[in-house]
């Protein structure tokens, strides 16, 4: 049974450099010594989750709840403004169309 290092790589296996891909290539040295084709094992490094916004974690549930409520209030305010702008644009467009049709009918 072959021994495994602390990184999970069997002894007698070496890591090759690969700048273009995040896949680590390991070639078994024993096969290379026996003039056989090298055995290549591909493994991916563990996924690292990167937060989109760096928000410090509150120390208590009460603070977390208050922070969530504040973020929801901000979101609701932004959505309210967007809805008002969309409504104003729609009403302006309808008024423009009605005015244009009314003036074009009078000319005929």
From Swiss-Prot:
This is Structural protein 1. Keywords: Host Golgi apparatus, Host membrane, Membrane, Phosphoprotein, Signal-anchor, Transmembrane, Transmembrane helix, Virion. It is found in: Virion membrane; Host Golgi apparatus membrane. Homodimer. The keyword Transmembrane helix applies. Residues 1-20 are annotated as: Disordered. Phosphorylated. It is a single-pass type II membrane protein. Belongs to the varicellovirus ORF1 protein family. The keyword Phosphoprotein applies. Residues 1-77 are intravirion. Residues 99-108 are virion surface. The chain crosses the membrane at residues 78-98. GO terms for cellular component: host cell Golgi membrane; membrane; virion membrane.
């Amino acid at each position: 049974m072959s021994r495994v290092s602390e990184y999970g790589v069997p002894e007698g296996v070496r890591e090759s450099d690969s700048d273009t891909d995040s896949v680590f290539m390991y070639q078994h040295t024993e096969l290379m010594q026996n003039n056989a084709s090298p055995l290549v094992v591909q493994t991916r490094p563990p996924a690292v989750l990167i937060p989109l916004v760096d928000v410090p974690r509150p120390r208590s549930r009460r603070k977390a709840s208050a922070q969530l409520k504040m973020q929801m209030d901000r979101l609701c305010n932004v959505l309210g403004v967007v809805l008002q702008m969309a409504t104003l644009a729609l009403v302006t467009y309808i008024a423009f169309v009605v005015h244009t049709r009314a003036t074009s009918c009078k000319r005929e």
